[in-house]
Amino acid sequence: PLVYEYVLDYLIGGFETYGFDKVITYIADNINLDETCVNSERKADLEKKVESLKKFAVGKKVPDFSTTDLNGDKITLSEIKSQYTLLVFWATWCPHCTNLIPELQEIYFPESSDKLEIVAVSLDESEDDLRGFLNEGRYPWINICDFKKWKGQIVQQFDVYATPTMYLLFNDKTILAKPMTFSELKNELF
């Protein structure tokens, strides 16, 4: 059973890393943890991971949230009326993120936010670091941060475990795609 648990955890982690959503969905739909795991703590961790995979699968509606953005404006995800919404979890201390965020300027036009709106949820703890990074570029989309890193309400609500994490949403806030890279995002949009 210990080897089974390790292999299952390893495979799920690997499939998540490479964006094999269909394989992950298949595992989540067909695994019966009651028959396989002995260690109750490990079983609880795997059950949580499997439930999260099911909850955030392509085609599922994401949970709604309301918060205040960095400009002090109230934001409610369900009230964003664009055709697509990109929800991106990132941080200034993540090198992949600091490469991705500037690339998003290529696809975002404030005057066309009815087509695509970006909601960037930062996991930063330092307001100075975040504002310093944002002030270096042109990032006119919705920027959110509660400065609680992995313990932030929205971060926990979405079971974020890595940065960057992206969800491309339809206007009804169902998941269209979970791109891993900017090129995958562009392929979904264009």
PLM ranges: what are they?
Residues P1-D73:
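Oxidative protein folding and maturation machinery
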Residues N99-G137, W150-V155:
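Structural microenvironment flanking redox-active thiols in thiol-disulfide oxidoreductases
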Residues I75-L104, E117-V119:
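Short active-site neighborhood of thiol/selenol oxidoreductases, capturing the structured segment around
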Residues K81-Q83, S113, V160:
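Active-site acidic short loop of glycosyltransferases
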Residues Y139, K148-L189:
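Thiol/disulfide oxidoreductase modules built on the thioredoxin-like
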Residues P1, D73, Y84-A91, P95, ...:
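N-terminal targeting or signal-anchor segments and their processing/structural boundaries
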